[in-house]
């Protein structure tokens, strides 16, 4: 059998070398692309966490002088009169009752009656100033929240690629865990958010949101939301766990229900 010509062996050797170098450069390129995507996604996640805190502070400082000037023109008071009139009247009645009770305990005289009128007048002026400041704060918070919500929504829409990468990381980390650890994490998250010991947290959150948007504290509405909303979330979550994990990992569903009991 004739030996293979040197030209063919040199050609094969050169082809192997080029293929190896191309594979190495391709691997390096893929690694650089992966590192870039990872760093971009982490920056995006950091911005997504920080924006809800930074946007309200920065916007409120810029909007509050404009809102104060707009409100003090006197043409806009009727907009929020319906929302705050009941609160203002309630405060005024309480102040008047306290002063009357205080003066009834003391000896009645003309000077005391005059002092009572002066003090009620001072408290009324303070009440009007408080009412004016409350309305300005409500409008500022409302505008800030609306602008911030629009900005964050646009940020989420424009960052679909980064969200997809972050979602893939979370899924990869979650599915790499054992079924027992998965069930533990799901149970921990559900108990913290919608468990039997979470109603007080829901009350604080709903009350804070209502005050931020200028709504008066209403115990009935808060109690109704606390007694129904977490139950609805719990039902939806259990249905999602059953539908999603019953096909992927039936043992996870069994472990979750066993730990939940």
UniProtKB/Swiss-Prot annotation:
Give the UniProt subcellular location, in the record's own words.
Answer: Plastid, Chloroplast inner membrane
Q: Where are the transmembrane segments?
A: 138-158, 184-204, 221-241
Q: Name one GO cellular component term.
A: chloroplast inner membrane
Q: What is its main location?
A: plastid
* Keyword Ribosomal protein among UniProt keywords: no
GO MF entry, a single one: proton transmembrane transporter activity
Entry superkingdom: Eukaryota
UniProt keyword Transmembrane present = yes
Which InterPro entries does UniProt cross-reference here? CemA (IPR004282)
What the entry lists under Pfam families is as follows:
CemA
* Alphabetical list of PANTHER family matching this protein: CHLOROPLAST ENVELOPE MEMBRANE PROTEIN, CHLOROPLAST ENVELOPE MEMBRANE PROTEIN-RELATED
Q: What is this protein called?
A: Potassium/proton antiporter CemA
Gene behind the chain: cemA
């Amino acid at each position: 059998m004739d030996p293979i010509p040197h030209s063919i062996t040199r050609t094969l050797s050169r082809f192997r070398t080029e293929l190896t170098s191309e594979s190495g450069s391709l691997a390096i390129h893929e690694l650089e692309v992966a590192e870039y995507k990872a760093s971009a996604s982490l920056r995006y996640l950091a911005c997504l966490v920080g924006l809800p805190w930074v946007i309200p502070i920065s916007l409120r400082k810029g909007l509050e002088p404009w809102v104060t000037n707009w409100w003090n023109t006197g043409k806009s008071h009727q907009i929020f009169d319906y929302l705050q009139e009941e609160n203002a009247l309630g405060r005024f009645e309480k102040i008047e009752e306290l002063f009357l009770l205080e003066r009834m305990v003391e000896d009645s005289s003309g000077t005391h009656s005059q002092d009572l009128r002066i003090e009620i007048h001072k408290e009324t002026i303070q009440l009007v100033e408080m009412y004016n400041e409350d309305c300005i704060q409500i409008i500022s918070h409302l505008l800030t929240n609306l602008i911030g919500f629009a900005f964050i929504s646009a940020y989420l829409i424009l960052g679909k690629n980064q969200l997809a990468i972050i979602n893939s990381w979370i899924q990869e980390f979650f599915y790499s865990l054992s079924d027992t650890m998965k069930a533990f994490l799901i149970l921990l998250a559900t108990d913290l958010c919608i468990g039997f010991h979470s109603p007080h947290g829901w009350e604080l959150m709903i009350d804070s949101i209502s005050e931020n948007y200028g709504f008066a504290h209403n115990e009935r509405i808060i109690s109704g939301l606390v007694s129904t909303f977490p139950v609805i979330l719990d039902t939806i979550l259990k249905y999602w766990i059953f539908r999603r994990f019953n096909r992927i990992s039936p043992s996870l569903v069994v472990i979750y229900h066993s730990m939940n009991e």
